[in-house]
């Protein structure tokens, strides 16, 4: 039976021990041409009036998640060995982004919000500011100098690709990368910066573990995903030994309907009514997958510098991806906000599992740091393409019903601040300190 992927994250559908959610996440970004329209109007208008800063705290997790409000893992505080980079405020920034959709040609059409006709621009004039220290803007010249003769990979789903494109755009102000490889679907790519002999890549592996996926680029599936929770995806493990730096992340693919395999047998599933299988829940699979990933990293002979990026919140309102959800806000959140149950669950699993292996990684000579972008990203509902994942979506009718993307990020946009954090962490940790 052919079924559309659907996302229904109603908290009432969660149970405390086995989180049963009738949910399938948005399809991955389509492999579209990277060539941009040279007739695009200038991107950056006059900066808006300066509103007050927007705080990252308090974020109140749902009661059902049982998060410990006073529990702050020590590695979060020490991530840059100076301050907690992830507690802070979004403050007005009149300088705007470091690049435009005219100066960077690595922006996928789905994230090229201004080209696609997004009418507002205030979301471009904010930057992340940690409470206890300054966060310099990304320095592309210094970054490329540090990365001479190095290899770097972003490993994960389409959010990782969104992230690497932000980095490529920032670095393009110094040197244009040369694409030297892409897979058939344009999901995994490799670029080279010739003057620096720096290799940058993105490896598409939405589960990090082995998976059989029967889904087209529009998110239509012909069968349930078969997920092998005790076997890593060779697409990234076979390349791992050649990498000097890694940004790795899980994601919302774990919310999709899936059959779980362990020890050469089916162990259960997530949301598989009528299959006569044990409902284990997405949280079971996510924890098992992360444990396997982190065991591989901490036990590897390759002493890479590894950043584990935490889950990315979406901002769908009045529905989800396939049920009419929208994101039409034009400013960051202010005051208290609640994290969706699924985001809070995934985030807590990430914090717990990374904390368990941080000391072991250090003993083995591996730098493992947390890149906790979840809470700061939660405050930016204004940063998504929304209906402007498509070119001029309302050209034919102002009230047209169009697909909204409230998961990925506009480029330029809030995701660029993730790279400010990356730069600060690598400069203040390990051999670059």
Protein language model annotation of sequence segments:
Residues 1-433:
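A compositional signature for long Ser/Thr(±Pro)-rich, low-complexity
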């Amino acid at each position: 039976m052919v079924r559309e992927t659907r996302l229904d994250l109603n908290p009432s559908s969660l149970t405390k021990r086995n989180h049963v959610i009738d949910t399938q996440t948005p399809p991955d970004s389509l492999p579209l041409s990277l060539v941009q329209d040279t007739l695009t109007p200038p991107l950056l208008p006059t900066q808006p009036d300066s509103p007050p800063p927007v705080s990252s705290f308090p974020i109140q997790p749902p009661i059902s998640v049982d998060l410990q409000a006073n529990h702050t893992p020590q590695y979060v505080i020490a991530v840059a060995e100076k301050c907690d980079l992830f507690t802070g405020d979004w403050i007005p920034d009149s300088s705007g982004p470091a690049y435009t959709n005219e100066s960077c040609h690595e922006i996928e059409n789905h994230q090229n919000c201004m080209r696609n006709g997004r009418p507002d621009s205030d979301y471009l004039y904010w930057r992340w500011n940690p409470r206890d220290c300054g966060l310099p803007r990304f320095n592309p010249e210094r970054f490329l100098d540090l990365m001479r003769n190095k290899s770097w990979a972003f490993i994960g789903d389409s959010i990782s690709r969104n992230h690497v494109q932000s980095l490529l755009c920032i670095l393009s102000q110094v040197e244009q990368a040369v694409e030297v490889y892409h897979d058939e679907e344009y999901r995994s790519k490799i670029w080279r910066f010739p003057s620096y002999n720096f290799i940058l890549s993105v490896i598409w592996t939405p589960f990090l573990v082995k998976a059989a996926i029967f889904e087209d680029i529009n998110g239509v599936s012909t069968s349930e995903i078969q997920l092998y929770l005790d076997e890593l995806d060779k697409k990234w493990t076979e390349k791992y030994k050649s990498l000097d730096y890694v940004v790795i992340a899980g994601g919302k693919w774990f919310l999709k309907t899936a059959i779980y395999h362990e020890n050469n047998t089916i162990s259960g599933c997530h949301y598989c009514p009528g299959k006569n299988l044990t409902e284990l829940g997405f949280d079971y699979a996510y924890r098992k997958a992360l444990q396997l990933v982190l065991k591989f990293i901490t036990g590897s002979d390759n002493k890479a510098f590894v950043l584990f990026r935490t889950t990315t919140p979406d901002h769908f309102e009045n529905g989800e991806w396939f049920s009419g959800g929208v994101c039409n806000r034009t400013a960051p959140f202010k005051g208290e906000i609640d994290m969706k149950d699924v985001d809070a669950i995934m985030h807590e699993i990430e914090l717990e599992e990374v904390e368990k292996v941080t000391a072991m990684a250090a003993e083995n000579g591996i730098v493992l740091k947390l890149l906790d972008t979840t809470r700061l990203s939660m405050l930016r509902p204004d940063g998504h393409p929304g209906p402007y994942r498509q070119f001029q979506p309302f050209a034919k009718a102002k009230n047209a019903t169009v697909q909204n993307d409230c998961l990925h990020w506009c480029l330029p946009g809030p995701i660029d601040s993730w790279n400010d954090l990356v730069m600060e962490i690598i400069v203040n940790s390990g051999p670059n300190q």
